[in-house]
């Protein structure tokens, strides 16, 4: 920041109010680069303009880029916390702690607010009257649990639309897996009582579940209903088998807890959350904070830990208790508890773990954080070497920290769509993915479609510029992209075309198992070819494949509901005959998704490899991504 501008902003800050609120710092391009909250806005913001010796290198860099500071007043400090988290989520400022998480972890959603509740896989916790359990580490594991609970407690698995329109029971009732509440073969009150066991199971109240089912089994045996008794016996054994696989921390606890630990150095910091539900560990979740050193003497660990808690629990399930690895003080503890209560509607205890059981959980989180940090850093260093090779081979002015790739897709004559995929530091940055419906082009015209997409993309000056654009195609597509960038005034951005070299077998319409990726550069006749095991190649081919996948999932979303076959059309290796076999065996796409690989592999024309591919691709569409349409 120029000296005169620095003094101008500093003088302006002196007039800030002393109330609570949120402040927004902007750079010369009027882009928000940092968002913070304060009990006293004037005192907090003025602290940035004190002697820079008291600041960390990151804060000094932030201050040097400040051109304007704005504020929003709030009635309370709790409101400031809530507003800060939502604004950070919306604007993603460069200098705020940004949670790096490769995916949104799945929850089990029990629609308890419905008249006839059912189970779903969910990627977000919403205030919709449902009960949420999780987060879990595997979508397939969640599907397996839902399938188990549906069978054990005879929970309906049909959609709400099917449920409301049925006039006679479906096959699920006929094979004894549902009680047909849709056609009133059971009252809604009795149905809810029947499925109550699944709720207790998910809450960890397993002794109650087993006791209740055992009583029903004995009653059925006394009445000589031996088939019913046998089914209940098998269900009890299945529940016991699942419980034996879970790590038990406290078998008497019914609390939901999260325990936090962290590990890091000058390369970054990894915060680990360990999720304990009713005394059982159901999973762990890593969150990497790049370029943040938790051991820096200038950084206040209480401040960044509270910032993490505020952002993390803006979107995630809030447990009964949060166990911390350090003491954040009474004032911040009470404030954080108020913030969490405001979000969840129920009391959450936040505390520094000092008891033996709590310390053991925090130590577990710390050890997981250390292990994941070392793996992440090793992987990150490989990515940096790959980006450095891209810079050298493509003769770029700087290392391409941000790479964007675009894919134009038209499926079976349907409307044309496009995807924008972003890699930052060599890995997917899904929060920056974008989807486009082509609005100005009729029919198939890739050049006009790409022109529209790039024009719309670069109207957003608030987005960071990429250091490289990857276009799927050879010299022709590269030439078109260069022409478009020149016409929209962005020829300063490097662009490369990615194409596959074909072998002679390709002329015979055979599938090419091994191809050589070729990269075409402006003004160069010969392509750049990387070694087959080069990290640079993994990054570049990875972003191309990701853009293609993301565009296809968009088509799938648009076509959802038009036909059962539409979702199966995208599964590689699945022809018409195999689709008919699947749809004959299973009632719906949801049933296929929840099937075991062994079930599918036993079908005529299927094997284990194909079964796992089908489940992977069908369930892939449920991975949480940033659903932003431009």
From Swiss-Prot:
Q: Where in the cell is it found?
A: Cytoplasm
Residue limits of the GIY-YIG domain?
Answer: 18-97
Record-linked PROSITE patterns: GIY_YIG, UVR, UVRC
Main location class: cytoplasm
What Gene3D superfamilies does the database record attribute to this sequence?
A: 5' to 3' exonuclease, C-terminal subdomain, GIY-YIG endonuclease, UVR domain, UvrC, RNAse H endonuclease domain
Q: What does this protein do?
A: The UvrABC repair system catalyzes the recognition and processing of DNA lesions. UvrC both incises the 5' and 3' sides of the lesion. The N-terminal half is responsible for the 3' incision and the C-terminal half is responsible for the 5' incision.
What is the designated name of this protein? UvrABC system protein C
Species of the source: Bdellovibrio bacteriovorus (strain ATCC 15356 / DSM 50701 / NCIMB 9529 / HD100)
From the UniProt record, report the name of the gene that encodes this protein.
uvrC
